[in-house]
Amino acid sequence: MTSAANKRSIMTLFSDKTDIYCHQVRIVLAEKGVAYETEVVDPQVVSEDLMELNPYGTLPTLVDRDLVLFNSRIIMEYLDERFPHPPLMPVYPVARGKSRLLMLRIEQDWYPVLAKAEKGTDAERAVALKQLREEILAIAPIFTQMPYFMSEEFSLVDCYIAPLLWRMQELGVDFSGAGSKAIKAYMARVFERDSFMQSLGVSAPKNLMDEK
């Protein structure tokens, strides 16, 4: 593992463009303004390089000189500590604990439902997207309280929920009715950030706030 990592003089991210966990890490790297190289990996054909670095062959995998990290949460928290500006986690332990719990709940409650929408049958997709839409609309008041998700500043929690909302939009979900204005405002605010656009490599949508 060490010899393979030492061959790389610049930080390298092994990534799949469609993977939501890789997307999280790309947002953080863009927020931090970190120079890095991307090794695009087909998750169905894991390269020998990746297997030498990461015995699980999972994505994302980050190589920073002789350090190899996998698991998006570990990578993102490392990047936040390694490059402290701008900070993406609260300063105080209680607030940090709450942020970690929010990330865990988003990952455990919503990511599996999104996976059903992306990989399931048409019927399973419809059911999964309906569930996601209804559950997010149910917490719409949260989006009115602060500019970002339960925070005055953009944070790692946003790096969890923004890729989810982006994929829902790509799958045709439209938020309408009670609470939708606040959700659309949040989506526009996050999707128009330079870091989010860089994470996609394309322009963010400009029509989210058309319906007011």
From Swiss-Prot:
The protein's name in its UniProt record: Stringent starvation protein A homolog
Protein family per UniProt: Belongs to the GST superfamily. HSP26 family.
Domain called GST C-terminal: residue spans: 92-212
One Pfam family here: GST_C
Organism: Pasteurella multocida (strain Pm70)
Gene Ontology cellular-component terms listed: cytoplasm
Function comment: Forms an equimolar complex with the RNA polymerase holoenzyme (RNAP) but not with the core enzyme.
Name of the gene encoding the protein in the UniProt record: sspA
InterPro entries, A to Z: Glutathione-S-Trfase_C-like, Glutathione-S-Trfase_C_sf, Glutathione_S-Trfase, Glutathione_S-Trfase_N, GST_C, GST_Omega/HSP26, SspA_C, SspA_N
Highest rank taxon of the organism: Bacteria
Limits of the GST N-terminal domain: 9-87
Gene3D superfamilies: 1.20.1050.10, Glutaredoxin
Residue ranges crossing the lipid bilayer per the database entry: none
